[in-house]
Design a protein with these regions (language model features):
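Bacterial N-terminal signal peptides that target proteins for export
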Residues: 1-9
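Hydrophobic alpha-helical membrane-embedded or membrane-associated segments
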Residues: 8, 12-16
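Ser/Thr-rich, Proline-interspersed low-complexity disordered segments
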Residues: 15-69
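C-terminal-biased regions
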Residues: 48-77, 92-227
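Short helix-adjacent coil turns
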Residues: 78-91
């Protein structure tokens, strides 16, 4: 054995002795532990979003007026048909593809934004949202679009209503009516009944905008008499 081989052999013995001396008697070599990471849930589509109103008005380009346009009145008729017949596919073709459709059951309640893909299933889904506090009682209103919004739309479409372009038509209010957008709209107004002093008036205001030359609904807000 030459000197180089002997030196390497001795160095190996010394290193092995040092490692053995550092290990505590009876100790075991620790194995690495891998933490389980939470897995994300894949959602098919995204749920509608919620916000408070009135918010800061946002300007959207709208080169053509909607007042008196045959396309617009035909679109309102199609919306009415979709509501009265629970036709989700038809409703989805009327929702603005640019920004969806904001829906507020109360004028100062929560705004729920539905995209066209949401609107297709609004007559079927049981997805519940908080619509805000009921005027007067302060009770919170919670429920699906089908259970909360649709009955009130059906009610006004089944009564003698009138259409008013870019006018917040009402039958007398204890508050100031405001339209929190800078785009155009139509008021769908029921004047109420004399038997109730016309205090049962109701107005659904429908925001309408043109996208690629076609009119679409971008907002729906309900107004009525409040104590």
């Amino acid at each position: 054995m030459n000197i180089k081989m002997l030196s390497a052999f001795l160095i190996g013995i010394i290193l092995l002795s040092a490692v053995t001396a550092c290990a505590a008697p009876g100790s075991q070599v620790a194995t690495p532990t891998f933490l389980a990471l939470p897995t994300s849930t894949l959602f098919i589509g995204t749920p509608p979003t919620a916000a408070q109103i009135p918010g800061t008005p946002v300007a959207y380009p709208n080169p053509a007026t909607i007042c008196g346009a045959p396309q617009v009145t035909a679109m309102i008729d199609s919306f009415k048909k979709a509501i009265l017949t629970s036709d989700g596919p038809l409703l989805s073709t009327l929702v603005s593809p640019a920004r969806g459709m904001d829906v507020a059951f109360y004028r100062d309640g929560t705004v729920i934004t539905y995209k066209p893909e949401h609107a297709k299933f609004l007559f079927e889904t049981t997805f519940e949202v908080d619509w805000g506090a009921e005027p007067g009682s302060g009770a919170m209103k919670r429920g699906s679009f089908h259970d909360v919004v649709v009955p009130e739309l059906v009610r006004i479409f089944n009564q003698p209503y009138t259409l008013h372009c870019n006018e917040l038509k009402h039958g007398g209010a204890t508050y100031e009516l405001e339209w929190p957008y800078q785009s155009e709209f139509y008021s769908i107004h029921f004047p109420g009944t004399p038997a109730n002093g016309n205090l049962d008036w109701q107005t659904w205001v429908m925001g309408i905008e043109y996208v690629s030359g076609r009119p679409y609904v971008y907002a729906l807000i309900q107004f009525f008499w409040e104590p």
